[in-house]
Amino acid sequence: MTDKTSLSYKDAGVDIDAGNALVGRIKGVVKKTRRPEVMGGLGGFGALCALPQKYREPVLVSGTDGVGTKLRLAMDLKRHDTIGIDLVAMCVNDLVVQGAEPLFFLDYYATGKLDVDTASAVISGIAEGCLQSGCSLVGGETAEMPGMYHGEDYDVAGFCVGVVEKSEIIDGSKVSDGDVLIALGSSGPHSNGYSLVRKILEVSGCDPQTTELDGKPLADHLLAPTRIYVKSVLELIEKVDVHAIAHLTGGGFWENIPRVLPDNTQAVIDESSWQWPEVFNWLQTAGNVEHHEMYRTFNCGVGMIIALPAPEVDKALALLNANGENAWKIGIIKASDSEQRVVIE
């Protein structure tokens, strides 16, 4: 009888011990995100979460997202500590625009070969994003899949569930002629447009780690984590009559603002009301990007736009700026039957 080598899962490229080491490393940071509604801890087959008792007619709101090719840039620059914040931000910001309070978050981390240090940095960032948004990181999936990804490359996806009172859902139906638009400043490109960012870096021959912009490396501007607006916006909703909120993600101004506008309304944006952060000027110049394309691809310094009645503007601005936001009046809503839903002038 011919002796055969005994094969193990590790021989096939899957290191269960590394996975267990990762769980042990992240338990502490995950525990810090726990909300009182969460039942049980990490390791169960499913996560249990009760609804907060303050809701009379609770409606669940769900969302899922990734961080696009910003992840490729983070891997190339070996900076993994904030990409998890981006992941949470892309999900929870989508929930809060409908008035929802994020409850819990789950992540999916897939890689060809699990590096415990890298995965721990990413998941610690996810936990930080959950802390910033007040939701619990209740579980996730770490998939080591040799042959599916090159080396230690990885991909991430996030899933979030929130809750809103049925009578307080924000859906844009109250938007009307004369409403004022308030902008919330962004921290940079957030997590959109990075295929164009990477193309601009390639064509320009620029090294983002040695190129300086506003006194710090360009890489710091490009990898600045997506701003999480949840706590500021939830407080605003409690105290001000908010008609609509648009999260400026893929598609920029042209595609995201119309998503919350009723028929026969038009958003008129005053371009003179703010200056683009320098990173957007650099991208436009280095890539020779047309103005219209900038507004279609990037947020150009505006992370969210909020529509509300004119008498509420001063109160809203005071609240938002007191909570650390950079908020300003950026435009108005006009009655219009034009097919052009957004005008920038």
UniProtKB/Swiss-Prot annotation:
InterPro entries: PurM-like_C_dom, PurM-like_C_sf, PurM-like_N, PurM-like_N_sf, PurM_cligase. It comes from the Bacteria. GO terms for cellular component: cytosol. The keyword Glycosyltransferase does not apply. Its EC number is 6.3.3.1. GO terms for biological process: 'de novo' IMP biosynthetic process; adenine biosynthetic process; purine nucleotide biosynthetic process. It is found in: Cytoplasm. It is an enzyme of class 6 (ligase). Keywords: ATP-binding, Cytoplasm, Ligase, Nucleotide-binding, Purine biosynthesis. It catalyses: 2-formamido-N(1)-(5-O-phospho-beta-D-ribosyl)acetamidine + ATP = 5-amino-1-(5-phospho-beta-D-ribosyl)imidazole + ADP + phosphate + H(+). GO terms for molecular function: ATP binding; phosphoribosylamine-glycine ligase activity; phosphoribosylformylglycinamidine cyclo-ligase activity. Pathway: Purine metabolism; IMP biosynthesis via de novo pathway; 5-amino-1-(5-phospho-D-ribosyl)imidazole from N(2)-formyl-N(1)-(5-phospho-D-ribosyl)glycinamide: step 2/2. NCBIfam families: purM. Belongs to the AIR synthase family. Homodimer. This is Phosphoribosylformylglycinamidine cyclo-ligase. It comes from Escherichia coli (strain K12).
